[in-house]
């Protein structure tokens, strides 16, 4: 069985040899990172280890205490709902058979209890939490539960999905879910309230990662080829913008869209974080307008495949997930136990400046202030 690193919109799979020991802390020399995931707005992240899970806030970068959640078992999947008291986790099955890899535990840390145990016939690959739903991803099925009663709302079929790719919206006004379709390169977008499904042919090769904006209006995707990142209107499937990460194949770990809809970031195995600029009129873009006429006249390379606006170099040997912080800042969490905060020039771009670099296992635990907030 593999260990995994979970991004906020998908999963990166690690072999057991790729799990990372806790650095710079001899007292915790046996602690290993099994999974890392942002919360829904990148204001915090959760780390699954071989001894329970840890929760961290990004504003500022501090460790939060968890009252009675299990600490003697390994969790290959750990997810949090904003900075609330609600969590979901899946055991890796190595340390303790009480937490097998085919069972999801929904934990309320305020009540110090497990709200529900969701058991499946096969291994759970990923879990996603939203205000209204708990989403459980298996290799070829996705189970959507209503959060208030934890009953199955629907089951979605996909092609083989070993990375557990899935993303959901996190605003009260919409309930949208995106996941792989039935063919390589295809994405299916579900409006969970109106039972509307849209299939988008995003790439020729298989999907490597995807993300939705908080309101479900935009969808960003990258394929296993790893050269292009595409932005779609999630409602009608229109291709709105295309970015080029590079010309060589690469594994893209995850993609993030800033909350102000100005920037897109991507991390990959090449060791460079790329930030791209979204078109200012991205949501009002009409492919039938005069710009489409320009697209016909100009060579394709002048209109599409826009290069990155800002960059930051990272250790190529470490997998990172990326998210956006405050204005013009990017947050990075690595499976080596590192946290970075970087800033880019919104006018000129270029090389980013590192503002903060810490190892989160070395942080002291603070009081339990998880209830409420984002």
UniProtKB/Swiss-Prot annotation:
WD repeats, residue ranges: 28-66, 72-117, 202-242, 247-286
Keyword Signal applies: no
GO cellular component terms, A-Z: phagophore assembly site membrane; vacuolar membrane
Swiss-Prot/TrEMBL keywords: Autophagy, Membrane, Protein transport, Repeat, Transport, Vacuole, WD repeat
Bilayer topology annotation: Peripheral membrane protein
Compartments reported by the entry: Preautophagosomal structure membrane; Vacuole membrane
InterPro entries: PROPPIN, WD40/YVTN_repeat-like_dom_sf, WD40_repeat_dom_sf, WD40_rpt
Purpose of the protein: The PI(3,5)P2 regulatory complex regulates both the synthesis and turnover of phosphatidylinositol 3,5-bisphosphate (PtdIns(3,5)P2). Required for autophagy.
Protein name in the entry: Autophagy-related protein 18e
Native source organism of the sequence: Arabidopsis thaliana (Mouse-ear cress)
Organism classification: Eukaryota, Viridiplantae, Streptophyta, Embryophyta, Tracheophyta
Gene from which this protein is expressed: ATG18E
């Amino acid at each position: 069985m593999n260990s995994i690193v979970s991004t906020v919109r998908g999963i990166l799979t690690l072999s057991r040899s790729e799990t990372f020991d806790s650095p710079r802390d001899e007292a915790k020399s046996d602690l290993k990172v099994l999974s890392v995931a942002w919360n829904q707005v990148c204001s915090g992240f959760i780390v699954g280890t071989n001894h329970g899970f840890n929760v961290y806030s990004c504003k500022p970068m501090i460790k939060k205490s968890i009252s009675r959640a299990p600490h003697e078992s390994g969790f290959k999947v750990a997810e949090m709902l904003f900075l609330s008291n609600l969590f979901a986790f899946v055991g890796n099955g190595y340390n303790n058979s009480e937490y097998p890899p085919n069972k999801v535990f929904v934990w309320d840390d305020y009540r110090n209890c497990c709200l529900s145990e969701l058991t499946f016939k096969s291994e759970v690959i990923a879990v996603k939490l939203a205000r209204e739903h708990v989403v459980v991803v298996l290799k070829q099925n996705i189970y959507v539960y209503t959060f208030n009663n934890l009953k199955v709302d629907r089951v979605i079929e996909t092609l083989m999905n070993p990375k557990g790719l899935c993303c959901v919206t996190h605003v009260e006004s919409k309930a949208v879910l995106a996941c792989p379709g039935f063919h390589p390169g295809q994405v299916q977008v579900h409006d969970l309230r109106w039972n509307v499904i849209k299939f988008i042919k995003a790439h020729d090769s298989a999907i490597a990662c995807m993300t939705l904006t908080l309101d479900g209006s935009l969808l960003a995707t990258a394929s296993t080829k790893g050269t292009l990142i595409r932005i779609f209107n999630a409602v009608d499937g229109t291709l709105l913008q295309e970015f080029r990460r590079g010309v060589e194949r690469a594994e893209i770990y995850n993609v993030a869209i800033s909350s102000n809809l100005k920037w897109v970031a991507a991390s990959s195995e090449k060791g460079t974080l790329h930030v791209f600029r979204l078109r200012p009129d991205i949501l009002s873009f009409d492919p039938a307008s005069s710009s489409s006429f320009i697209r016909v006249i100009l060579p394709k390379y002048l209109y599409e495949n826009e290069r990155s606006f800002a960059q930051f170099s990272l250790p190529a040997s470490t997998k990172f997930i990326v998210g956006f912080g405050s204005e013009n800042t990017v947050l990075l969490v690595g499976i080596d136990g590192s946290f970075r905060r970087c800033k880019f020039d919104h006018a000129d771009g270029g090389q980013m400046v590192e503002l903060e670099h810490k190892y989160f296992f070395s942080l002291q635990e603070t009081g339990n202030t998880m209830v409420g907030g984002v």
